[in-house]
Amino acid sequence: PDTGGFISGLFAPDHSQLKELQRTQKQKKKQQVKSASHNSPVPAGVAPGTLITHSNISVSSVYKGIDRVVKYDFTHRDVPEAFDGFRIAFISDLHYKSLFKEKDLDGLVRLLIAQQADVLLMGGDYQEGCEYVPELVAALAKVKTPMGTYGVMGNNDYERCHEDIIREMKRYGMHVLEHKVC
């Protein structure tokens, strides 16, 4: 399916920020070419992204609680050239304190920071108790990206703690996408 219109409607950043980001990405690509430990740089027209997933099944990982990091290269004719090299990190369904434990949170934050993403997207279902929201959001706020952090609510978030999550996300400068596009 053609998702170009959806993507451009969902995330339309300030083009001046995007130009600066594009310059930074070109510098990163040059460094990648020089480094023998990296794969070849991403080809033109490809926007790399990062998907970080978690489940309660134990799988060997550098970071406790993180089962896998999946990287995708995305190309589409409607994605502007300015997004060449743009990196998106996505997390979802942490269910903090139920599936995802406190001891795993520091590892997740370090992993997200190591991805050097341009934007962090959060897909909801953050918690399993309102008392855990401040701790979780404060930890995720340590992940700084040039284009910011954007989050939506999951079904569990609407059932409880909805206002707590919104308040904490806004407190740390995160953008809550609720029935709107930015």
Please give the residue ranges for each predicted region.
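Acidic, histidine-bearing metal-coordination/catalytic regions of metal-dependent phosphoesterases
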Residues: 1-87
